[in-house]
Design a protein with these regions (language model features):
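Structural recognition of the beta-strand scaffold that forms the well-ordered cores
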Residues: 24-28, 54-58, 63-67, 84-89, ...
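Short, solvent-exposed loop/turn segments at the edges of secondary structure
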Residues: 20-22, 51, 80-84, 119, ...
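Short, well-ordered coil/turn elements that cap or connect secondary structure elements
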Residues: 51, 59, 119, 184-186
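Cell-envelope and extracellular/periplasmic
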Residues: 30-31, 80-94, 111
Length: 194
């Protein structure tokens, strides 16, 4: 996952540089259908009196922008900002449903933050859970949130490997010769005695 830093300048309102120890992750939607991650980052940077910010923005195409360091407070959920890493997600759907690329990037980002700060899945929340605000709008619905929450907090299944056996020989010398032919063809090969 690539994270682009576009840190908001330190200031009184949207990046006070107050320290915070991450204990939970809060998912938001931008509330601006079709807006890009770049546009929101620019808004945060140029509107210091807006009193709004977030640590991360996930774009429609899955790009990730960091606006506030993880260990600083961002202003995104009224009085629930201390200890919270906020993630704004961009969207194209008028109902607020996230794009697949956004969900994939959100999954990577959330798993990274969970591992880095030892945050349990139960502490990955919606803005709605913190303050009652209808955000992210499409995912205020409990079933939709449960499905999204499962996707963004689930670790990928361990990759299974399958072994292909080629040949069985009664002579070790013949087995070694054949293994060498397989290696010359560009494949890994070894001889096992059974």
């Amino acid at each position: 996952m690539q994270i682009t830093d576009r840190l908001i300048p330190r200031g009184k309102y949207n990046r006070p540089a107050a320290k915070s120890v991450p204990k939970r992750i809060c998912v938001h939607y931008t509330g601006d259908c079709g807006a890009s991650a770049d546009r929101l980052a620019l808004f945060f940077t140029t509107n210091s009196a807006a009193k709004t910010s977030s640590q991360y923005i996930v774009g429609i195409d899955g790009e990730v922008i960091r606006c506030v360091p993880d260990n600083e407070i961002a202003y995104a959920a009224a009085g629930k900002n201390n200890g919270t890493i906020h993630i704004e997600v961009c969207y194209k759907d008028k109902a607020g449903k996230f794009e697949e690329k956004s969900i994939s990037a959100l999954n990577e980002l959330v798993l990274y933050l969970m591992e880095r700060y030892h945050i349990a899945a139960k502490n990955v929340l919606r803005h709605y859970d913190l303050t009652g605000k209808l955000c992210p709008a499409y995912y205020v619905d409990a079933a939709r949130w449960a499905a999204l929450h499962e996707r963004i907090t689930a670790k990928p299944a361990a990759q299974k490997l399958y072994r292909v056996q080629v040949g069985a020989f009664s002579s070790r010398a013949n087995a070694e010769n054949y293994a060498e032919q397989v290696r010359r063809a560009g494949f890994g090969a070894f001889v096992v005695e059974t």
